[in-house]
Amino acid sequence: MTAAPRNPLIVIPARLAASRLPDKPLADIHGRPMIAHVLDRAREADIGPVVVACADAAIADAVAAAGGRAVLTDPAHPSGSDRVWEAVCRVDPDGRHDAVVNVQGDLPTIDPAAVRAVFGPLARPGTDIATLAAEIVRVEERTDPNVVKAVVELAPGARDGRALYFTRATAPWGEGPLFHHIGLYAYRREALARFVALPPAALERREKLEQLRALAAGMTIAVAIVDTVPLGVDTAADLERARALLDPRTGARPALP
């Protein structure tokens, strides 16, 4: 039986080349770059050290100014997972960290409890990867292809289960809840090493969902159910919402946009 991971490393991948909101890791939120706020949230989770895997020197400089640790990675990486793995290998070549938590760099309002929640299911024997989902409550999201659905084998009353599929379609069919997948991941270290070495899968290319590569290879993904979906900053409007949520005058930081 594989022992439960006990020493996670949090890695935040970040790059400037975003099509809808260029330079978004450096976007100003109340006098600080967005990446500094993400760094704060990851530190507040208090489950392990935090590293930012940067594609650009400007991001590394911003992280250093915020008192964080940054690693410059190959800007040509095809995915955030590849960037995360390079950072892991560089900061921990001896393999002291037995798990890796990937926190996306565009989640400045993420609840630190969500970061802790995604790490928890790795304790279950046989789990390679863990991620999060929340029940869809907005009717329009059920048919929105930009809202990725997690199809989860979930016992009645359970708060975590096993992923059967991820899709942009409305699934599963029939009565019952649908779950909005949240792109936060925790990996056993050996699972991340295996994942980045795999070739893209046919369904991954069709759905444009990287996590399907793991399912196609027979890897087990656990899904923890949380109450809310964090605000991902992809547009100028999202940025304004993040600024409102992080306004120091209100003192509030809700996880739900």
From Swiss-Prot:
Belongs to the KdsB family. Keywords: Cytoplasm, Lipopolysaccharide biosynthesis, Nucleotidyltransferase, Transferase. This is 3-deoxy-manno-octulosonate cytidylyltransferase. The gene is kdsB. GO terms for biological process: CMP-keto-3-deoxy-D-manno-octulosonic acid biosynthetic process; lipopolysaccharide biosynthetic process. It comes from the Bacteria. GO terms for molecular function: 3-deoxy-manno-octulosonate cytidylyltransferase activity. Pfam families: CTP_transf_3. Pathway: Nucleotide-sugar biosynthesis; CMP-3-deoxy-D-manno-octulosonate biosynthesis; CMP-3-deoxy-D-manno-octulosonate from 3-deoxy-D-manno-octulosonate and CTP: step 1/1; Bacterial outer membrane biogenesis; lipopolysaccharide biosynthesis. It catalyses: 3-deoxy-alpha-D-manno-oct-2-ulosonate + CTP = CMP-3-deoxy-beta-D-manno-octulosonate + diphosphate. CDD domains: CMP-KDO-Synthetase (cd02517). It is found in: Cytoplasm. Activates KDO (a required 8-carbon sugar) for incorporation into bacterial lipopolysaccharide in Gram-negative bacteria. GO terms for cellular component: cytosol. PANTHER family: 3-DEOXY-MANNO-OCTULOSONATE CYTIDYLYLTRANSFERASE (PTHR42866), 3-DEOXY-MANNO-OCTULOSONATE CYTIDYLYLTRANSFERASE, MITOCHONDRIAL (PTHR42866:SF2). Its EC number is 2.7.7.38.
